[in-house]
């Protein structure tokens, strides 16, 4: 997939976030599934090759959209090699050897795009207008929106992680740096929290 197509996908994700600004106040697994679902329902806006890929492998795309959060204590990963690094996201995309893995990688990149908007615009704005401390306020604003979504998307995130994602997990295991825990242990902990 060319850089232009990746840029188009990220541009569409940013467009959807701008079109749905009320959704950008929280980036929990349920919210990432909500945003990923919005992309899947807007495939007519995507280049046809990407749209066809996401329609063929929606669960791989959605799993990618939450997989970047599977690492616990990412600050203990090697510099520039933590799960939310764009270099890591692009490494995952480049290493994707088949269509399901490419859909997964695009979901992973969509997750990073959504977090970039949240962490660089929406959360700081909310911290400013509410006089919250960054340590408490950040988590508060990241989790607040999911309460407005109801249980549908958090339940969908939970059901999603129970599916077989062995190939995607194997890809992550080869790229992600361990934190305090191995990537396998991080994933087990994450699945227990969703």
Annotate each predicted stretch with a short phrase.
Residues 1-9:
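Bacterial N-terminal signal peptides that target proteins for export
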Residues 11-108, 112-180, 188:
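N-terminal, motif-rich segments that launch catalysis or mediate targeting to/interaction with membranes
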Residues 182-194:
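A mid-sequence, solvent-exposed acidic-amphipathic segment
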């Amino acid at each position: 997939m060319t850089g232009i197509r990746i840029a188009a996908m990220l541009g569409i994700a940013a467009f959807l976030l701008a079109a749905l600004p009320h959704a950008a106040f929280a980036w929990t697994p349920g919210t990432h599934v909500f945003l990923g679902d919005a992309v899947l329902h807007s495939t007519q806006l995507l280049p046809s090759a990407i749209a066809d890929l996401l329609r063929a492998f929606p669960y791989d795309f959605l799993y990618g959209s939450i997989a970047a959060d599977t690492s616990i204590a990412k600050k203990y990963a090697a510099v520039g090699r933590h799960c939310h690094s764009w270099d890591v996201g692009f490494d995952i995309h480049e290493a994707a050897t088949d269509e399901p893995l490419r859909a997964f990688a695009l979901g992973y990149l969509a997750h990073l795009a959504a977090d970039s908007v949240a962490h660089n615009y929406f959360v700081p704005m909310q911290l400013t207008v509410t006089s919250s401390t960054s340590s408490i306020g950040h988590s508060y604003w990241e989790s607040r929106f999911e309460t407005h979504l109801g249980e549908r998307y958090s339940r969908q995130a939970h059901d999603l992680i129970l599916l077989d994602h062995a190939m995607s997990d194997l890809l992550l295991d080869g790229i992600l740096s361990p934190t305090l825990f191995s990537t396998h242990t991080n994933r087990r902990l994450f699945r227990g929290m969703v």
